[in-house]
Amino acid sequence: MTATIRALAAAAGLALAGTSAPAFSAPNDYTFEPVKPDVKNGTGSELAVRIVHKPTGKPVEGVVLFRTRLDMSPDSMDEMTAKHAAQPSKEPGVYKFRADLTMAGGWALKLMAKVPGEKETVQATVVFRAK
């Protein structure tokens, strides 16, 4: 009987291993990437970030972005910041912002996010180039 129980437990473990949803995830299992890295310089620039779960390659929906900062740290000007505001997006896993970029060059959008099912806060920096 013990051998039967062990065999059933092993079979159940193999069945669960084949599911598409990750059983355990980590903050580094997500990638934040610019939809378009080159954006227009000036008022009303549109920035879009795609969040992807690396192991599955699928977009991540329902992310809560609770702290954002937009600065020129890629060009060694951390103190140069820009006003920005979240905008609605209809594309799964894409999070949009409207920004007032005051200078051409590299802009870093720094994000802190709560990802559904993830215990830890996920942090990322997405770089855009204003032209």
Which residues make up each language-model segment?
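N-terminal signal peptide c-region/cleavage motif recognized by signal peptidases
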Residues: 18-20
